């Protein structure tokens, strides 16, 4: 990680990130820190993916971590699901558009393009598994805008007490 490189340059031992947490709220604190690192410290995509897997594995006893792992998503889809969940939990932002997750795939242009295209044409596993849905605005769907489904809010994020998109 960037902290590791900094520590090596300064001839210090790197500080390991403590990924063990007590509950889902703390897990999202850690997830938010990792996302911030990815964006601000130019953490490599694969290194970010590895850190996320370690976070989920270390906290497999939490229902959120086990639910997410049980979905069997490929890395690119899992990262986007977690990115979307973090947007909702951290910023109460339900709308997910490509510019929101462009930083996730920084340096991975082909992967980003594939994700945008799959979401737009409805072939994404996130849509097929009922995790993302097209955003509906006054009866019109927007092909570039998606939201987490009520299933994600009611089942996967249940420990956080987040209201489903249909509840206001």
Regions from the PLM with identified roles:
Residues 1-168:
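Intrinsically disordered, low-complexity N-terminal extensions of AAA+/P-loop NTPases
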């Amino acid at each position: 990680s960037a902290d590791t490189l900094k520590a090596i340059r300064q001839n210090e031992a790197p500080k390991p990130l403590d990924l063990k947490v007590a509950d889902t709220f703390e897990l999202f604190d850690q997830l938010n820190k990792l996302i911030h690192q990815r964006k601000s410290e130019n953490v490599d995509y694969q290194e970010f993916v590895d850190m996320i897997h370690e976070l989920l594995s270390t906290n497999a006893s939490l229902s959120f971590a086990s639910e997410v792992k049980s979905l069997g998503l490929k890395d690119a889809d899992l990262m986007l699901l977690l990115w979307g969940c973090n947007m909702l939990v951290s910023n109460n932002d339900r709308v997910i558009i490509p510019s929101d997750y462009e930083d996730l795939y920084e340096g991975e242009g082909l992967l980003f393009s594939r994700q945008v295209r799959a979401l737009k044409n409805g072939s994404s596993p996130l849509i097929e598994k009922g995790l993302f849905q097209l955003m509906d605005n006054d009866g019109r769907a927007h092909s570039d805008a998606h939201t987490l489904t009520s299933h994600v809010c009611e089942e996967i994020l249940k420990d956080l007490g987040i209201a489903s998109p249909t509840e206001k």
